[in-house]
Amino acid sequence: MSIQNEILNAIASRRSCRAYKPEQITAEELEAVTTAGTWAATAMGRQSPVMVAVQDKETLAELSRLNAAVMGTKSDPFYGAPTAVLVLGEKNNPNGVQDASLVMGNLLLAASGIGLGSCWINRCLLYTS
């Protein structure tokens, strides 16, 4: 590609990570990543997705257990990451999945941009009535 810039390089170099250091990320790092999520494009500018950051080990373990029960597996969907950011889309919003997906994209790029590993965990997707 003949055009090079910081954004295109970040997009091209981002990779999924499935092995994490046990050290917790800093509040500043978490804020940087989630702020990028809030800047994601959304249909009609609704900004409807909600991000929930989970750093408590017991809560992460419970979320992992619940996911394993739904998926019929015992593996940790978060690969031992000390932080998980759940992105929730509105069930009745016809663009909810797309809006949440755009937020996820921003989260992944922001994490990569500041040197953090990240991975889209689609297995956590669960529709409830």
Question: Could you tell me what each predicted segment is?
Answer:
Residues I114-R123:
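Glycine-rich phosphate/pyrophosphate-binding loops
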Residues N92-Q98:
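Short pre-catalytic strand/loop immediately N-terminal to key active-site residues, enriched for Gly-Thr
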Residues L109-G113:
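Short hydrophobic alpha-helices that are characteristic scaffold elements of the AMP-binding
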Residues S101-V103:
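Charged helix-capping and loop-helix junction motifs
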Residues M1-T83:
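N-terminal amphipathic, basic helical "cap/leader" segment at the start of enzyme domains
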Residues Y127-T128:
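Conserved small/polar residues in nucleotide/adenosyl-binding loops
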Residues R15, G89-K91:
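Short, histidine-centered active-site or binding-site loop motifs used for metal coordination
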